[in-house]
């Protein structure tokens, strides 16, 4: 059964773990401002010499997310940030550096592929593969557009740099790259995912061998599912992406790995 950590807080469990994977969006900030309580948690972890990774499904390199965190008020812990975009970039540089790609997502995400931007094509028919970082700015709300766009190209490779389906930017809910990837799968395509809940991002961002690990996040489909796949304990923040479904709780639920079946 899960434990409610609302009263005792994470500090009551801190000595049970050597490594913490902590989500950023929904835990450290809401897309607009930092949650001060979360900074106290990070400070407490550092004080107790605990290792942690600020692991986020963001389709941008580490450096871009760090710049954003600085802008909204995070004053340190930059070296602990790791993004799904960084994991994607590593794979793309190793496997697709000289292949032509079609970018699905807003122009602001260009920094993910600026090292090989010369391979970007504007004609979808010329692409060897797709890089999906999100939705086009003029097609942010209607997913049907992407079914029409991609239905003839399900044989191409599709790299999804953010498995999240949705995100809340303040009080506004937005679709993410994962929603487009899901459509691509529904029309028969195969997707290469980077980020939570898929195992590679955990191994790329930290040495997890032999360590007791706690994953902290607000998304059941990525943070919690990823922890369960890895057989890690996990802490669900109920005030995040699932706040409407869990509005009556407003607590933190700790699930140990032996309770993972309850969340499957």
Question: What does each model-found stretch correspond to?
Answer:
Residues 7-13, 117-129:
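Short acidic low-complexity segments
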Residues 10, 28-53, 61-64, 80-87, ...:
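Short, acidic loop-to-helix structural element flanking the phosphoryl-transfer center
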Residues 17-31:
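Asp-based phosphoryl-transfer active-site loop
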Residues 40, 46-119:
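Active-site phosphate-binding/coordination module
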Residues 124-141:
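Short, well-ordered secondary-structure micro-motifs within conserved domains or adaptor modules
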Residues 193-223:
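Conserved Lys-Pro-Asp/Glu-containing loop-to-beta segment of HAD-superfamily phosphomonoesterases
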Residues 216-249:
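Acidic, Mg2+-coordinating phosphoryl-transfer loop and its flanking beta/alpha structural elements
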Residues 255-264:
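Single conserved hydrophobic/aromatic residue that forms the stacking wall/gate
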């Amino acid at each position: 059964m899960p434990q409610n950590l609302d009263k005792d807080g994470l500090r009551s469990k801190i000595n049970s773990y050597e490594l913490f994977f902590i989500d950023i969006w929904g835990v450290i900030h809401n897309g607009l401002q930092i949650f001060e309580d979360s900074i106290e948690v990070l400070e407490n972890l550092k004080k107790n010499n605990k290792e942690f990774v600020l692991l986020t499904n963001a389709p941008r390199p580490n450096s871009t997310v760090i710049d954003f965190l600085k802008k909204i008020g995070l004053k340190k812990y930059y070296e602990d940030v790791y993004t799904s975009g960084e994991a994607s970039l590593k794979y793309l540089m190793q496997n697709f550096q000289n292949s032509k790609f079609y970018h699905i997502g807003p122009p602001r995400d260009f920094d993910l592929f600026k090292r090989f931007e010369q391979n970007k094509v504007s004609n979808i028919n010329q692409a060897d593969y797709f890089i999906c970082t999100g939705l086009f700015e003029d097609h942010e709300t209607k997913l049907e557009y992407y079914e029409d766009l991609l239905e003839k190209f399900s044989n191409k490779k599709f790299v999804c740099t953010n498995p999240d389906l949705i995100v809340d930017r303040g009080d506004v809910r937005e679709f993410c790259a994962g929603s487009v990837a899901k459509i691509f799968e529904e029309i028969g395509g195969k997707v290469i995912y980077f980020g939570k809940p898929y195992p590679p991002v955990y191994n790329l961002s930290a040495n997890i061998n032999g360590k007791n690990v706690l994953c902290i996040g607000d998304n059941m489909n990525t943070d919690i599912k990823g922890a369960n796949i890895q057989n890690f304990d996990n802490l669900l923040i109920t005030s995040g992406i699932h706040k409407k479904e869990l509005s009556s709780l407003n607590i933190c639920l700790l699930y140990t790995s032996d309770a993972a079946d309850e969340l499957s």
